[in-house]
């Protein structure tokens, strides 16, 4: 037994020196994230390639869950990043079945009493095929829809809403978006012409409305 232990002791350094060092994953030079930034995550693919996530963590939005904002994804060793997700986006980034999933979250008014609930808006899959990184984007098909009674309630809220530049006004626009996605043509008309009624939109609420309209445009394309 002592002879075997001695042999293993002698061979271990040889095995250790033969192992390949862990791949170094650095962020390419970019205006989005410092090239000195260390990856928050590294996703290792079965073809031997890896993708690093560089940026900032968000831990307060959903209790017990680490999300990411203002970050890039880059293949380790590449000179260019795959893409950049800005500070206005909060994403859940996971890895399964040799695929990186980037889920962009949004506070949809689909919770209890139509309260906002953070759910994936878009889901992007990033994987390798034929040596190339492939990206496929889709809208989350599981976003809850409104019942006809809920849509009618949104219309009533619209009629009673004051012309003010507020979060409540944008909450109403969010509800019109869900009503539109639930099949209401009237809701789409009201949403598209939203500024005709709410003429005071400015600053952050105006930017939020523009975001909702971009979401509507993407939903119509998909």
Model segments located where?
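Bacterial Sec-dependent N-terminal signal peptides
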Residues: 1-24
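Exposed acidic/polar residues on beta-strands and adjacent loops within beta-sheet cores, strongest
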Residues: 19-222
């Amino acid at each position: 037994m002592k002879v075997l232990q001695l042999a293993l002791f002698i061979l271990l350094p040889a095995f250790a020196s033969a192992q390949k060092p862990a791949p170094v994953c650095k962020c390419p030079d970019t205006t989005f994230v410092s090239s000195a930034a260390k990856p928050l995550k590294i996703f290792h693919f079965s073809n031997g390639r890896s993708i690093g996530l560089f940026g900032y963590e968000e831990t307060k939005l959903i209790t017990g869950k680490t999300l990411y904002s203002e970050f890039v994804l880059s293949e380790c060793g590449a000179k260019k990043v795959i893409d950049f997700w800005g500070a206005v986006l909060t994403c859940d980034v996971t890895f399964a079945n040799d695929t990186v999933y980037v889920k962009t979250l949004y506070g949809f008014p689909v919770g209890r009493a139509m309260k906002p609930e953070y759910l994936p808006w878009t889901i992007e899959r990033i994987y390798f095929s034929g040596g190339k990184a492939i990206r496929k984007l889709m809208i989350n098909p599981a976003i809850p829809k409104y019942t006809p009674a809920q849509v009618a309630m949104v219309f009533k809220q619209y009629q009673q809403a004051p012309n003010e530049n507020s979060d409540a006004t944008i909450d109403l626009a969010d509800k019109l978006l869900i009503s539109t996605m639930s099949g209401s043509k009237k809701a789409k008309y009201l949403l598209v012409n939203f500024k005709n009624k709410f003429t005071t939109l400015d600053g952050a609420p105006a930017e939020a409305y523009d975001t909702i309209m971009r979401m509507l445009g993407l939903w119509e394309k998909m």
